A protein has these predicted regions:
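Juxtamembrane loop-helix boundary motifs flanking transmembrane segments in multi-pass membrane proteins
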Residues: 40, 74-78, 157-161, 221, ...
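Extracytoplasmic catalytic-loop and juxtamembrane helix elements of membrane-embedded
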Residues: 70-85, 192-213, 217
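Membrane-anchoring hydrophobic segments
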Residues: 14-18
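Alpha-helical transmembrane segments of multi-pass inner-membrane proteins
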Residues: 2-9, 20-33, 43-78, 84-192, ...
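Transmembrane beta-barrel architecture of outer-membrane proteins
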Residues: 99, 269-270
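Solvent-exposed, non-membrane alpha-helical residues enriched in polar/charged side chains
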Residues: 35-36, 105, 230, 272
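Cytoplasmic juxtamembrane interface segments
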Residues: 21-41, 207-225
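TM-adjacent membrane-interface loops and short helices in multi-pass inner/ER membrane proteins
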Residues: 196, 205-208, 212-264, 271-285
Length: 304
């Protein structure tokens, strides 16, 4: 955060730098306050889970209702309107994805209504991720499940009580099955609506189509953005262009290659964007936060 503030000195646009820096400061303060609140209040986790359940319910309802309100079942392209009041569908999908770990925790640590309703929401969110059809959320969901399975196996190996091993193994498997079921039924839902209501000939929004587009590099746009970002990084590798100024720096590369002067707002890769804005020193600082938190998480796992 401090280095971001310093980078404003050499930023292309200082006003934009201050604006983005302010957002990072707010995120940092919110994180500190949240940690302090949870350490002080024993009921904070439960309250957080309840808030997550309420908001997730609203998100799921808004996604499914708006699917028909905006005629997405007729024209799949209209799913761009499914933003859930988050600005766009990609942010909406990420917001749904971020709620899943809290719901996993609720299934593993709570009982009765909270546990079973959290399972339902895991199914519903996986279902909605298919409706939103963002490739990054597909990858994110399966990475989450992979981490959950890894933690589950680790926990079972460390636990010496057979009753606990059976109980928790069943819950981990149930979470994975529910999430995958939501994914599969969501895909069937998309295909059903396409077959009965759509007027176009090709379904580009099923799981198969979206995964194939990743494998075939239909992300050529992303790859081109990363290549252009690497070009501006080479021009200023030490200091970068200042916090929040990636979109301005990349203009000199992308405008020369495009006729419409429409450039990318982001690098679609946090590490490349940090490198372009803060230089090598800022990138190392940013990477170190992941390393520190990763080491702390591993220590916590082995402690208990």
């Amino acid at each position: 955060i401090v280095y971001m503030g310093v980078s404003i000195v050499w930023a292309i646009n200082c006003v934009e730098g201050f604006s983005i820096w302010n957002r990072w400061i707010l995120i940092f303060i919110a994180m500190i306050l949240s940690i302090g609140f949870m350490l002080k209040d024993n009921h904070a986790i439960k309250n957080l889970i309840i808030c997550t359940i309420v908001i997730a319910t609203i998100n799921v309802l808004s996604c499914i209702i708006c699917y028909y309100v905006f005629d997405v079942h007729i024209s799949q392209r209209n799913n761009l309107k499914l933003n859930g009041f988050y600005g766009n569908k990609n942010i909406f999908a990420v917001a749904l994805l971020f709620k899943l770990p809290f719901l996993y925790y609720a299934v593993l640590r709570f009982k009765k209504f909270i546990r079973y309703y959290s399972l339902f929401l895991i199914f519903a969110i996986s279902f909605c991720l298919i409706i939103l059809s963002t490739r990054s959320s597909f990858i994110g969901l399966f990475l989450q499940l992979a981490v959950l399975c890894f933690y589950g196996v680790f926990y079972q190996i460390k636990s010496r009580k057979l009753s606990l091993i059976f109980k928790h193994s069943r819950l981990y498997l149930l979470i994975c099955l529910v999430a995958v079921s939501g994914f599969v039924l969501g895909d069937a839902f998309i295909k059903y609506n396409f077959a009965h209501y759509s007027k176009i000939e090709t379904n580009n929004y099923s799981i198969g189509a979206r995964v194939t587009s990743i494998a075939e590099g239909n992300s050529k746009g992303r790859l081109l953005i990363w290549k252009n970002t690497c070009e501006i990084i080479k021009q200023s590798p030490l200091l970068g262009y200042g916090v929040g100024n990636h979109k301005l720096a990349i203009m000199k590369v992308e405008c020369a290659k495009k006729h419409d002067y429409i450039v990318s707002d982001h690098a679609h890769n946090d590490f490349l964007e940090m490198f372009s804005e803060l230089g090598i020193f800022g990138l190392l600082n940013y990477v170190s936060t992941y390393l520190v938190f990763g080491i702390m998480a591993l220590k916590q796992m082995f402690r208990y």
